[in-house]
Swiss-Prot record:
Active-site feature positions: 425
Xref: SUPFAM superfamilies: FtsH protease domain-like, P-loop containing nucleoside triphosphate hydrolases
Highest classification ranks of the organism: Bacteria, Thermotogati, Thermotogota, Thermotogae, Thermotogales
Gene3D superfamilies the record matches: 1.10.8.60, 3.30.720.210, P-loop containing nucleotide triphosphate hydrolases, Peptidase M41
Pfam families on file: AAA (PF00004), AAA_lid_3 (PF17862), FtsH_ext (PF06480), Peptidase_M41 (PF01434)
Chain residues that bind Zn(2+): 424, 428, 501
Name the UniProt record assigns to this protein: ATP-dependent zinc metalloprotease FtsH
Free-text cofactor note: Binds 1 zinc ion per subunit.
One Gene Ontology cellular component: plasma membrane
Family of this protein: In the central section; belongs to the AAA ATPase family.
Role this protein plays: Acts as a processive, ATP-dependent zinc metallopeptidase for both cytoplasmic and membrane proteins. Plays a role in the quality control of integral membrane proteins.
Residue stretches spanning the membrane: 8-28, 109-129
Keyword ATP-binding: yes
Gene field: ftsH
Amino acid sequence: MNGNRPNYISLIFAALVILSLFWLVRSFYFDTSAPSKMSFSDFIQMAYEEPTRIAEVVVRDDGILRVTTKRGEYYEIYAPWFMQDSETIKVLSEKGVRVTGEKGVSSSFWVNVIGNVIFIGFLLFMFFFMMRTISGRNNQAFTFTKSRAQMNRPGQARVTFKDVAGVDEAVEELKETVLFLKDPGRFSKIGARMPKGILLVGPPGTGKTLLARAVAGEANVPFFHISGSDFVELFVGVGAARVRDLFNQAKANAPCIVFIDEIDAVGRHRGAGLGGGHDEREQTLNQLLVEMDGFDVRQGIVVMAATNRPDILDPALLRPGRFDKKVVLDTPDVRGREEILKIHARNKPIAEDVDIRVLAQRTTGFVGADLENLVNEAALLAARNGRDKIKMEDFEEAIDRVIAGPARKSRVISPREKRIVAYHEVGHAIVSSLLPNADPVHRISIIPRGYRALGYTLQLPAEDRYLVTKQELLDQITGLLGGRAAEELIFQEVTTGAASDIERATELARRMVCQFGMSDKLGPLSWGKTEQEIFLGKELTRMRNYSEEVASEIDEEVRKIVTESYDRAKEILTKYHKQLDELVELLLEREVLEGEELRKILKTELGEEMVNHDKLRAAAGSEQDS
């Protein structure tokens, strides 16, 4: 409720201003008690010719006559000589007119003066009270040209390189920046110049902001943090003014670090878009370029910025002398994920059954923010279940929640639909388990999760991969189509549950043909040109650069890949129909089936054939290692 108090004060102040204006206008223009002016000759004529019209005459010692008629009319006449005109006073008295005397200044005058002074004083008090309230809220009403940067002083919530993991190369790159901030003379002695700007590039959540804070923490210098969107406002020129103010603050607190997060909000390529771009944003960018040229790196100011869209930044921003060093933060590998998990878990009570190495292997593709969220989700689950330590099952459930969404056990599914979902998921699992290049199955579940998923089959790669072979892609497409193949094999009809699988399989097959050159018929050619459309604000689009005949051949090749993979999936499930039925019954009973249990059952059922498959998978893994 405290946040609404300034709004109430503003409303009260506005109401008082309106009432005061109404009162003043009414007093000056509509006051019926205000006297009218009358000449002395008109008064003498009325006194002698129409004395019956006059009700009262008040003679003031300052020479003012106040004449009131019987009709309620009120007149004022300035006639200081009237006090000596005894004849007229006698005539009025004889005609029954009341004639009285009064002091020069009436008490009503002082009442009005005092009332106005009190009212104006109250308005001034309210005005200064509002100004004080606004000043307490960072004086936002009058300092919109000031920089919005948040300044962290040395020692305040200090972050160091010990709090950063999974980006060892980036840390090594930035250690020399720390040395420069601690001892600039060490570099100037040998004529070395530190980069004026350092651009941190990487996907969202990889720790760009954290790494910038760690550099400031290691160097123990002030840290200015501002978002690129904080520069541009409604008013023209505000962005450029804020840039100037930011660098003035930095110069006053040197040595320091200025960190601009999401710099693409203000540093986008100039002139992009219809109409030539955004003038205010470009003016802000121009001022930023000028400021980066204007300061001497020997002052100890290092400008750092972060973006996940380096392709749309203006070239002038990236030239030497501005952001002349790029530091790339990539998705962490299994070792990096393990170190990140250890950092986030070090202040939490972890049970003895938790294996951080296994969790790192099962979180392929997770970035630092995902892993922090994973640990926090596991802690929440442990607290919800009344445990004082976080167990491995909490982490497993947290992984499922992050990947597929929270379980929705309250959703009512008919027995027939539940059986269809079970066959669909087991179809995925069996096909993927029997393909030598598919990712191992980690878990099968028919518990609804997230928005629309009625079940899921979670496959996690055994290790990080940076290259994918053609056969691995084909096995992946075949595994995606295993669910639909099981539905058609068992129920002789298909459902809408495979829509997402078909979409992913088709897209993967099209990329194999058009992007990876993996079509035997069309050969190692790239079809479709990736361009940056200037009229789309430098957005990536894929332009068609081939004929209608080639387009037809591409569609035919995509159809061939998907159809052959689908037939292959049906062939596998037809051959292992018995195992499919047994696993479905087990899954319907338990609702969740772990990957290890699945492989154990298949090895028991298939014997030597499953052993040979394990050898094929191991051989594929050793080829990747080489």
